[in-house]
Amino acid sequence: MASGVTVNDEVIKVFNEMKVRKSSTPEEIKKRKKAVLFCLSPDKKEIIVEETKQILVGDIGEAVQDPYRTFVNLLPLDDCRYGLYDATYETKESKKEDLVFIFWAPDNAPLKSKMIYASSKDAIKKKFTGIKHEWQVNGLDDIKDRCTLADKLGGNVVVSLEGVPLK
């Protein structure tokens, strides 16, 4: 069921910037987004970038020690969001980076919000071409353990996520 909600051009721009990893200057790399949240506009007519809810690559190691945990802490406990997370992980064979599309719909979000976000998910997914990993999360218990994301990325072949070994 389509909701009629549109995707703001800035959302597509952010996705394309995160998706394309071109060689850049150290300053450009620092400004690159590691994670970002998207929400509905106040009038519920379009999906927009939630400006205050993002992690820049340049913040890692300075303001942000653990990008995954910081991303989880950005999620509101009482409302839905869409998110993009640029996961850096290691398998037994190689290092990899993949974008993960996350649909956050916590159990205690208002029913109306869950319905609008669920029915608008296809609109944003269609704009995010080439996403390999999609994850619907319904509560902190589903997302707080980095092993759960590692399972989504490749199961038991993932040995570390964001430089942290998996047990």
Swiss-Prot record:
It is found in: Nucleus matrix; Cytoplasm, Cytoskeleton. This is Cofilin-2. PANTHER family: COFILIN-RELATED (PTHR11913). Belongs to the actin-binding proteins ADF family. GO terms for cellular component: actin cytoskeleton; cytoplasm; nuclear matrix. InterPro entries: ADF-H (IPR002108), ADF-H/Gelsolin-like_dom_sf (IPR029006), ADF/Cofilin (IPR017904). One of its GO terms (biological process) is actin filament depolymerization. CDD domains: ADF_cofilin_like. A motif (Nuclear localization signal) lies at residues 30-34. Residues 4-153 form the ADF-H domain. Controls reversibly actin polymerization and depolymerization in a pH-sensitive manner. It has the ability to bind G- and F-actin in a 1:1 ratio of cofilin to actin. It is the major component of intranuclear and cytoplasmic actin rods. One of its GO terms (molecular function) is actin filament binding. Keywords: Actin-binding, Cytoplasm, Cytoskeleton, Nucleus. The lineage of its organism: Eukaryota, Metazoa, Chordata, Craniata, Vertebrata. It comes from the Eukaryota. Disulfide bonds: none annotated. SUPFAM superfamilies: Actin depolymerizing proteins. The gene is cfl2.
